[in-house]
UniProtKB/Swiss-Prot annotation:
PROSITE patterns per the UniProt record, alphabetical: CK2_BETA
Species, as recorded: Neurospora crassa (strain ATCC 24698 / 74-OR23-1A / CBS 708.71 / DSM 1257 / FGSC 987)
Gene from which this protein is expressed: ckb-1
Protein's UniProt name: Casein kinase II subunit beta-1
Cellular component terms per the entry's GO annotation: cytoplasm; protein kinase CK2 complex; UTP-C complex
Cited SUPFAM superfamilies: Casein kinase II beta subunit
Length: 333
């Protein structure tokens, strides 16, 4: 495949431009050529070497094909068996076609597994952040999230278990992509680590912005609410949850009873404490460790003081080696 400028398009660019592959980032060839980044993938992908060569646009070696063509020419010149020749050619070409289809599927699988690792690297997550700012991953379908941008994630790191899902950082829920063309994308190509790592890498993103607004930087916007809890800004912790953000089903203005068969269920999943400081596990851990250290130091000091009590009896007797006790009375020689 070639681009409009006449320069042949790489396999990676062609793969990412396919319909339904809009979530993918273009993995750099430097990342793929580093053997450390491919550790453990040889056993997961069939025809690993050929698939890797296809991804890197490396031309396969044609030595075997040339030898077979030379042998066929020699058979023609020597008047070999011409009856079996067409059948052999058909079998040879069918084998080549089947190998290409297997290599193509293996290349897609291998690229997906490499992509899972690449988007967790510095260069890969920066690429995904640019796509996130442009809204390439879509928005949350929940009304109270106000069109918060979503992130592609997988529910498993093992290929073939589930398709890609969209994680909303506003309501902390996972949704199926709205378009059916994404239902063929394996969720393992994005993995379970990317979503949390993205939010920890870019904590300054203002998640309260809607999909139509640009993602601003909390540190540059001069926001007063810059309280940090567990490494994240407090206003970015599930802004779509809590009081006033829980849907209440009503019929003609009357709330549907919770004990009704069609009543609301599991609304506690949308709840959030009013005081977010109770979620600050890092602060509580530091305080607990500090109190434990104080108790331990006090225990050590008390044990040291107890050891210092009861000096030797010789010191009470002015250290005289000639002082002895006889029947409870002291005498000197």
């Amino acid at each position: 495949m070639s681009s409009s400028s006449g320069v042949p398009e790489s396999w990676i660019a062609s793969f990412c431009s396919l319909l339904g592959h809009e979530y993918f980032a273009e993995v750099s060839e430097e990342f793929i050529e580093d053997d450390f980044n491919l550790t453990g993938l040889q056993t997961q992908v069939a025809m690993y070497k050929e698939a890797l060569e296809m991804i890197l646009d490396v031309e396969p070696e044609d030595d075997d094909d040339e030898e077979e063509e030379d042998e066929e020419d020699e058979e023609d010149m020597s008047g070999g068996d011409g009856i079996n020749k067409p059948h052999g050619e058909r079998r040879h070409h069918s084998r080549i076609a089947s190998d290409l289809s297997v290599i193509e599927s293996s290349a897609e699988m291998l690229y997906g597994l490499i992509h899972q690792r690449f988007i967790c690297s510095r260069a890969g997550i920066q690429q995904m952040s640019e796509k996130y700012e442009l809204g390439h991953f879509g928005i949350c379908p929940r009304t109270n999230c106000n069109q918060t941008r979503t992130l592609p994630v997988g529910l498993s790191d093992t290929p073939g278990e589930d398709t890609v899902k969209l994680f909303c950082p506003s309501c902390l829920d996972v949704y199926v992509p709205p378009n059916s063309r994404f239902q063929t994308v394996d969720g393992a190509f994005f993995g379970r680590t990317f979503g949390a790592l993205f939010l920890m890498t870019f904590p300054e993103y203002d998640l309260t912005k809607t999909g139509a607004e640009s993602v601003s930087n909390l540190t540059r916007s001069g926001s007063d609410d810059t309280t940090v809890i567990n490494g994240m800004y407090a206003r970015n912790i599930a802004p779509g949850l809590g009081r006033g953000k829980i849907y209440q089903p009503k019929i003609y203005g009357f709330k549907v009873s919770e004990i009704a068969r069609s009543g609301p269920r599991m609304q506690w999943l949308r709840s959030k404490p009013d005081d977010l400081s109770v979620l600050d596990e890092a602060r509580r851990y530091a305080e607990q460790q500090g109190s434990d250290d104080e108790d331990e130091s006090m225990g050590v000091s008390s044990r040291t003081a107890s050891r210092r009590r009861g000096p030797p009896r010789r010191q009470k007797q002015n250290g005289s080696p000639m002082a002895i006790e006889q029947n409870g009375a002291e005498s000197e020689l």
